Every structure is written in C-alpha cells, then in structure tokens.
C-alpha cells in the first residue's frame, strides 16, 4: 500500500512524497527509497526552489492533467529541464476546454484570447488551492493534505461547499435576517386578517 504525503521546506513550499509500505525493505544500501511526487507548486515561478536539486522528480498524479513523468532519476538529477516542462504544461489543455464548452453548448466557439484567459484562471485556481491547503496542513502540523484542508479553503475563499465530502460536524442552518420592511409587511397582513 502506498501513501502520498506532503512535507514542507523552510519556505513553506509543499513537497509531495510517495512511500510504499513493505514488510521487508532491504536493498544493496540497506534501505529502499521511492521517488517523491512532484506538485504544481514546486515548479511555479512564484516559489523559491532552493532545495529542488536534492529532490527526485516523478510523475504528476491526481491532478487530471494526463501528463507523464516529469523526470526520473537519482538524487543528483538536474531539474531545470523538468521545471520548464511542468510550467509549460497547463492543468487543462485547449482541446479539453473546447470539449467541455461543447458539453454545455454545442454551438459556442471561444475566441483565442478567451481560451488563454480561462486556462490561466484554471492554473491560478489550482496553484492557489494547493498553496493554501498546504499551509492549512502545515498549520495542523501534518505531513498530509486532507480533504478537510481543501474544504476549508473552498469554504473560506470561495464560499463553496463540495457535496459528497461531508464532515462529522453538523453545519448550522443559517436563517435569513428579518428586515424591518418584512416586519412591517407581516404587521399589515395580520391587521388586514383581523378586520375580516
């Protein structure tokens, strides 16, 4: 069984690692090391990758990109080519975006500028989500990003609640505030009812 977990460097940047549980982990050096997983935030232009030369590259997984491995190799591998490759690979491709638009409306055509803008918004959304959820996991002093971290980010920043990922706590029902105008209308209705 394998676990995907996240560790954080001194700058708060998330590093994803994949570990396998083995009954016997022996090799020529005595330990079996699995390559860590890459995340989109590791190679973003906004982060400081001071420790990227000591990380292994690996396939990007769980993001729905359909991309293959970024790089694989030893601990001394150079990541300049893999960093440039992952920055140029969008989270959503233009053909997939066109396919999604056609699912909504078959007659709609997007301009080139609109496609570029939507792809940039998607990339920014995913990068922001990964960065914030990593910070929430770090605040919990955890090495794993959990569903509740993503839920917290979506609920606080976008006021979104994703159905199907319920928590143990019950959310209180928020009643709408009764305005003064509404109270006056109700009083008028009651007064009219009493007349008849």
From Swiss-Prot:
Gene3D superfamilies: Histone, subunit A. Its main location: nucleus. Keywords: Nucleus, Transcription, Transcription regulation. GO terms for biological process: RNA polymerase II preinitiation complex assembly; transcription initiation at RNA polymerase II promoter. Residues 17-97 are annotated as: Disordered. GO terms for molecular function: DNA binding; protein heterodimerization activity; TBP-class protein binding. Residues 93-160 form the Histone-fold domain. Residues 48-58, 72-86 have a biased composition (Low complexity). Belongs to the TAF12 family. TFIID is a multimeric protein complex that plays a central role in mediating promoter responses to various activators and repressors. This is Transcription initiation factor TFIID subunit 12. The gene is Taf12.
């Amino acid at each position: 069984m394998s676990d995907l977990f996240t560790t954080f460097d001194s700058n708060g940047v998330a590093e994803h690692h994949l570990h396998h549980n083995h009954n016997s982990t022996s090799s020529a050096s005595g330990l079996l090391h699995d390559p860590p997983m890459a995340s989109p935030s590791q190679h973003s232009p906004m982060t400081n990758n001071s420790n990227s030369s000591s990380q292994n590259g690996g396939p990007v997984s769980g993001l729905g990109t359909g991309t293959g491995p970024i790089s694989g190799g030893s601990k001394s591998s150079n990541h300049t080519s893999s960093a440039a490759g992952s920055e140029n690979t969008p989270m959503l491709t233009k053909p997939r975006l066109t396919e999604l638009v056609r699912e909504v409306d078959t007659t709609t055509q997007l301009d080139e500028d609109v496609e570029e803008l939507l792809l940039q918004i998607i990339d920014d959304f995913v990068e922001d989500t990964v960065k914030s959820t990593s910070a929430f996991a770090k605040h919990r002093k955890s090495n794993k990003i959990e569903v509740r971290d993503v839920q917290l980010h979506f609920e606080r920043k976008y006021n979104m609640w994703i159905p199907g990922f319920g928590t143990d706590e019950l959310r209180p029902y928020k009643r709408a505030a009764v305005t003064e105008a509404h109270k006056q209308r109700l009083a008028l209705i009651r007064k009219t009812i009493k007349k008849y």
